[in-house]
């Protein structure tokens, strides 16, 4: 009997080819698009390459017709609001910089979709992510790097559970992007040349602050820009407008370029300093998800990534009694930002990951 797999179809070329590849491999494939955004705002998401709007549904439906597979649209709006939107807003309100795609992957694209898929008798779910599922000799499942480093998406998948990984297929991770487009062309898929989605799907204009203000109905108080000695340099528009390492939009004239070094919600201050002050070699990670191992030992060597675009750097990990991990990089890293994920790799797969809580800069003046 054929194994049944539900493929999360965003209307893009990657998930479309994932469905095609799995059908070619003999799976009983069902296509599903997750409706996650409010109807009154869906028009905002219908831009070319988007994954949340009406155009995504239309494109996915056309692909399913070509592949001759069943296709459904499932409503996950409540879960998306709870696990992604509310999280996004609350993190900015506490002066953290969140990664909503990571939350969406864990709690919506996997937890919610997997639960619904199992209810309809599926054995697996599948996506078009550039990553691979691997089972290690110790029996645990992990996420292994895609064959193409430029498209690798393992960073955003670090917090999937063992049960989720066991039930997941990721066929696209074995290919490079040009190969995926060529497969789509040869299969006659209508999205073969569709552009990739680049933005946070619910804030396509990048104006996070306006989105948060509209979502909460709150007005966020202006405050002071200060230097590291506490001298007032000017006025800021509200903490939600800023993130660590930011240079644009500060409105401060100086002889040398200035950047956001720290956000202080207790005093409603934004600390401004030079680029050199942004470098740290130590950070502390909370909410750890252990993937390749159940735990780590003091002195564990790894390659750490502290943002999606980070190439990764050698580091040493030490577990702490409070459940956090202390990470010390061999070389200082720029603008490690509270709220962002830190993901650690060994031998080309995810060891563990978590959320950056605090960092200690090279002067040691930002202790946890």
Q: At which residue positions do the language-model features occur?
A:
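AMP-forming adenylation/ATP pyrophosphatase catalytic core
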Residues: 126-135, 142-368
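ATP-dependent adenylation/nucleotidyltransferase module used to activate substrates
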Residues: 1-158, 169, 178
């Amino acid at each position: 009997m054929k194994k049944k797999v539900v493929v999360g179809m965003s209307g893009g070329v990657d998930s479309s080819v994932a469905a095609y590849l799995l059908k070619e491999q003999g799976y009983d494939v069902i296509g599903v698009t997750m409706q996650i955004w409010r109807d009154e705002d869906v028009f905002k998401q219908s831009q070319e390459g988007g994954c949340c709007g009406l155009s995504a549904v239309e494109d996915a439906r056309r692909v399913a017709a070509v592949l001759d597979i069943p296709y459904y649209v499932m409503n996950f709006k409540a879960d998306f609001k709870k696990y992604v939107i509310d999280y996004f807003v609350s993190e900015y309100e506490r002066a953290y910089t969140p990664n909503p795609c990571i939350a969406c992957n864990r709690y919506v694209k996997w937890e919610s979709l997997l639960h619904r898929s199992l209810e309809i008798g599926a054995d697996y779910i599948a996506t078009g992510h550039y990553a691979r599922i691997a089972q290690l000799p110790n029996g645990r499942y992990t996420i292994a790097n895609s064959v193409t480093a430029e498209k690798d998406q393992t960073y955003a998948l670090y917090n999937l559970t063992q049960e989720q990984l066991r039930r997941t297929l990721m066929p696209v991770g074995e290919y490079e992007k040009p190969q995926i487009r060529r497969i789509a062309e040869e299969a006659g898929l209508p999205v073969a040349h569709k552009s990739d989605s680049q933005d946070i799907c619910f804030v396509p204009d990048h104006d996070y602050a306006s989105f948060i203000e509209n979502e909460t109905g709150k007005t966020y108080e202006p405050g002071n820009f200060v230097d590291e000695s506490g001298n007032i340099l000017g006025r800021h528009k509200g903490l939600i407008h800023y993130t660590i390492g930011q240079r644009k939009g500060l409105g401060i004239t100086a002889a040398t370029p200035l950047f956001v070094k720290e956000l202080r919600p207790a005093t409603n201050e934004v600390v401004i300093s030079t680029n050199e002050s942004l470098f740290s070699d130590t950070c502390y990670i909370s909410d750890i998800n252990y993937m390749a191992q159940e735990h780590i030992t003091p002195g564990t060597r790894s390659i750490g990534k502290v943002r999606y675009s980070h190439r990764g750097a050698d580091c040493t990990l030490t577990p702490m009694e409070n459940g956090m991990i202390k990470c010390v990089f061999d070389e200082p890293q720029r603008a490690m930002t509270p709220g962002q994920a830190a993901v650690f790799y060994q031998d080309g797969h995810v060891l563990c990951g978590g959320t950056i809580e605090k960092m200690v800069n090279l002067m040691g003046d930002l202790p946890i």
